[in-house]
């Protein structure tokens, strides 16, 4: 299958300084983030056209990740008018998956095997008086929330015997939490999402 749904230029060999100049960094209320992305050689994912014509089955499958050499049992098209594709997902070099560069969670997990010091657990947040719906920064300035184990209930992240997924917030600096998260496994896989687990980027 051709990777027609990946409309990115390969940037793995581009100097980091040059890559950063093309990165969209906006801190604050506007939480849009577009990291410099290449094409994954390890993972592919299901891509669905989201409009009024989309069916439940296609919408549910959107974003599911498969190994590049994996055979998909129920591959698209699922029906006569299906417009879904399975193609190579985007990859991002560690240090570009968040707005914080080498201080970001993607860099720290990739090269240190843990979150940065500024991540705080829910238990610690509540101990500081945090109430749901309130701005986290009011209770933990300059910190982000570590969510603990991510259940992967929809099975969109790759599964394997003994694999456990974890999650943490990224990229918010004021106001409410945004839709950006990082997820990583106990066996070395790292992905980021900027739309609350609908689609992912591989961190390499």
How does the language model describe each region?
Residues 117:
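Conserved hydrophobic ligand-interaction patch in extracellular adhesion modules
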């Amino acid at each position: 299958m051709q990777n027609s749904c990946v409309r990115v230029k390969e940037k793995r060999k581009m100097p980091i300084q040059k890559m950063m100049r093309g990165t969209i960094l906006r801190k604050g209320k506007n939480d849009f983030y577009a990291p410099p992305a290449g094409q994954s050689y390890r993972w592919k994912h299901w891509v669905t056209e989201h409009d009024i014509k989309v069916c439940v089955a296609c919408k549910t499958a959107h974003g599911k990740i498969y190994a590049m050499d994996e055979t998909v049992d129920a591959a698209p098209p699922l029906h006569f008018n299906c417009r879904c594709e399975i193609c190579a997902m985007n990859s991002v070099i560690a240090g570009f998956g968040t707005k914080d560069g080498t201080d970001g969670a993607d860099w720290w997990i990739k090269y240190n095997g843990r979150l940065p010091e500024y991540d705080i657990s829910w238990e610690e947040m509540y101990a500081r008086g945090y109430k749901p719906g309130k701005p986290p920064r009011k209770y933990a300035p300059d910190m982000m929330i570590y969510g603990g184990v991510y259940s992967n209930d929809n099975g969109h992240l790759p599964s394997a015997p003994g694999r456990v997924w974890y999650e943490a917030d990224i990229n918010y600096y004021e106001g409410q939490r945004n839709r950006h998260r990082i997820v990583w496994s106990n066996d070395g896989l790292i992905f980021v999402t900027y739309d609350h687990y609908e689609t992912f980027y591989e961190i390499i």
